[in-house]
A protein has these predicted regions:
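Alpha-helix-loop-beta-strand connector modules within alpha/beta enzyme cores
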Residues: 1-25, 53-81, 114-119
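Glycine-rich phosphate-binding active-site loops on the catalytic face of alpha/beta enzymes
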Residues: 1-11, 41-53, 84-117
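Electropositive, surface-exposed helix/loop patches at the edges of structured domains
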Residues: 21, 35-39, 78-81, 86
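Histidine/lysine/aspartate-rich catalytic loop segments that bind and position anionic ligands
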Residues: 22-51
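Structural motif
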Residues: 35, 68, 89-91
Length: 119
């Protein structure tokens, strides 16, 4: 929410680059759509040390995004194999993960497992 306005980013980057915004509430998602964002991040869904101090938005906001977003969105924040299905059950079809892969004993296998769950 503190980054360049999407219109200014578009002027600087041109029409071919994708511009996104992190959102933490439905009103922010709606504003991102009005502002011309190409996609949004929705989260953090769960508590995560990669976003310390950020309250999780939970599955209700992901469900709202799935119902109302006219642009692609990525559920993000504390998503891993153990809770991925619950995120997908909200209607989300795209997720972003960090620790589920980077902190896995076998990151390549963790990535394959997550991709299989997304099929």
């Amino acid at each position: 929410q503190g980054d360049l306005p999407p219109a200014l980013a578009r002027q600087l980057l041109g029409p071919e680059k994708l511009i996104g915004r992190s959102t933490h509430a439905l009103a922010q998602l709606q504003q991102a759509m009005r502002d011309g964002c190409d996609y949004v991040g929705v989260g953090p869904v769960n508590a995560t040390p990669t976003k310390p101090g950020r309250e999780p938005v939970g599955l209700d906001y992901v469900r709202q995004a799935a119902a109302e977003s006219a642009i692609p969105f990525f559920a993000i924040g504390g998503i891993e194999g153990a809770n991925l299905q619950a995120v997908l059950d909200t209607g989300a079809t795209q997720v972003a993960v960090v620790r589920a892969i980077t902190e896995a004993a076998d990151p390549a296998q963790a990535a394959r497992d997550l991709l299989e769950m997304l099929q």
